[in-house]
Amino acid sequence: MADLSFLNLEEVEEEAKKVMPKMAFDYYSTGSDTCYTVGENRSCFSRYLLLPRMLRNVSRVDTSHELFGIRSSMPVWVAPMAMHGLAHPGREVATCRAAAAAGVPFTFSTVATSSLQEIQETGHDNRIFQLYVIRNREVVRRWVTEAESRGFKALMVTVDAQRLGNREADARNKFTLPPGLALRNLEYLSSASTVQARDSQDGSGLMKLFTSEVDDSLTWEFIPWLRGVTKLPIIVKGLLSPADAELAVQYGVDGIVVSNHGGRQLDYAPSGLHMLPAVVAAVRGCGSSIPVLVDGGVRRGTDVIKALALGASGVLLGRPVLYGLAVGGQAGVERVLQLLRSEIELSMALAGCSSVQQIGPQLLLPAPSAGPAPPMPAAQLCKL
C-alpha cells in the first residue's frame, strides 16, 4: 500500500523521487539550461507577505470558484502535463478521476498516454483539452472536433513551445517512453515512434518529435482559424509579455494563462507570478474582463492566495499532481489536492477572508528581505 502520510506538496516530491525511475523524475522535475527559471517560479512567492484582517466572521469559509461556467471546489485547476504514464500505470485516467473526486477541473495534454475517449469515460464533467499546434491542420481540426464532441469544456492552446527548450537532463538520459506506453493522440503520426527510439547521438526522442511536428511558424492568425472550427472557449497558455496579452485580447481569446512552461522553455524568463500584475493591467486596460490564470511554483495554499491577490482569476497546479500520482496513483493525487484545499481554506480564514471574492491586493505587502518585488501602488498602500 502506498504511503500517503506526506503533509505538504514539497514532501510529496521527496517521496516521488524515491519511487520513480531517474529518467521519469528528471523529466518532470528539471527545466531548461541552468534551470534558473524553475527556481525563480518558486522563490517569487517569498517576495510577498500576507497582511491579515481580524474580527471577521470566518466560521464558514467558501473556497469554491467558477470560470468559463466550470465549477471548482477551489480556485485551482490541474495543469496540462505530458505522459502521466511515466509516473503511474493509471496514467491520465487516474489523475482525471482524482480531480473529479476533488471537484477540480482537469486539463488533458495533447502529449498524453491516455486517449480522449478514456478521459471522457472517467465521467469527470469539467475537462479542458490542451492543444499543441502541429503543422498538419487537419490533424489539429480532428483533435479539436473530437474534444468538443466528447464534452470537453474549453481549449487551452500552448503558445510557448513552438520549439522545445534545451532540457539537458532529457538529452543526458536519452529520454524515451518505456515499453507499453504510447502517445495516444499522436499514434497516427508517423513521427510518434521517435519518442520511443533511443539514439546515442541525438539524445531525447521527445525533442525529435517536437522538431518534426510542432508548427514553429505559428502566429496570432491561428486564433481566428481555430475560432472557425470550434465553439469552445479558447484559452491561450504561455504568455508573459503585457504586449502579447493586449494582442490576445485583440484576437478575441477567452482567457489567458500567464506561464513560462514550468521553467522548461526559455531559461531566465520571469516567473508567471512576477508578470501577473502587468498582464492583468494590460488586459483590463483594453477594456476586457477575460480571466487571467497563472501557473508555476505553486506549493502552498498561501501561494494560491498571493496569486489571487495579485489579480489572478485562478491557478494551475502542475508537478505536485504528478508526484502524487507517482507515489499513490489516484489516491496520491486526491491527497495532494485535499492538502492544498485544506491549506487554502485555513489560510483564507487566518487572513480574514470567508470567500474567494474577498481576496484582493489589500492582503499583500512586499517582503523586506526576500529580494525585490514589484512596487505597490500608493492607493493600495493607503488601504492597509
From Swiss-Prot:
Domain of life per record: Eukaryota
Textual note on the cofactor: Binds 1 FMN per subunit.
Positions annotated to bind pyruvate: Y27, Y132, R167, H261, R264
Cofactor: FMN
Subunit structure: Homotetramer.
Its job: Catalyzes the oxidation of (S)-lactate (L-lactate) to pyruvate, with a reduction of O2 to H2O2. Also shows a low oxidase activity with glycolate in vitro. The very low glycolate oxidase activity indicates that this enzyme is unlikely to be involved in photorespiratory glycolate metabolism, a pathway in which the oxidation of glycolate is taken over by glycolate dehydrogenase (GlcD).
Name of this chain's protein: L-lactate oxidase
